């Protein structure tokens, strides 16, 4: 095996609550496998919302908004696996994670698809409803970025109401453990492939940017 492998977790919760507890559980599983695990709390990152410019539909360079998003994106690019974890708020994805996937996606990731072939994991935390919907949205986001999703049985959805309740959801935590184990298996497999073959591409990434040549922002062309 090469240098220590790493999983980066993106925590889309506004507080140090159940989602953070779940990621601490995930960290223990990863570290038991010898994988470095780092959690980035979006609540601690200065993050601007997308503005009205619309330039992201046409420009070939990164977003010009100056905030903490590029630093997080750089950590994602350097990692071997990435977990997107978010609580359910208002029957949907918590606003911090929603803002992040918009800003990171259209501002930085769409041009060269630097997350291609990285291993992805999805965790959603909910009181009762919409855990599956949030899990599905984040899954589609990972697929959009050409990441590799590994099957681990039931989705890693954890149910909790009050602080600390997530740690009482034994089935949910079991699914989180299985997710991290399967991510680690795939990361190690890909690492071994690179080491034995000397290839860094692993899987063909095809065209760099599927949006090139699409006229998506016709309003800017109008006088």
UniProtKB/Swiss-Prot annotation:
InterPro entries: Flavoprotein-like_sf, FMN_Rdtase-like_dom, ISF_SsuE-like
EC code: 1.3.8.16
Cofactors demanded by this protein: [4Fe-4S] cluster
Molecular function per GO: 4 iron, 4 sulfur cluster binding; metal ion binding; oxidoreductase activity, acting on the CH-CH group of donors
Coiled-coil boundaries: none
Catalytic activity: (2S)-2-amino-4-deoxychorismate + FMN = 3-(1-carboxyvinyloxy)anthranilate + FMNH2
Cofactor, free-text remark: Binds 1 [4Fe-4S] cluster.
Alphabetized Pfam families for the sequence: FMN_red
Free-text function comment from the UniProt entry: Converts 2-amino-4-deoxychorismate (ADIC) to 3-O-enolpyruvoylanthranilic acid (OPA).
Family indicated by similarity: Belongs to the SsuE family.
Name used for this protein in its record: 2-amino-4-deoxychorismate dehydrogenase
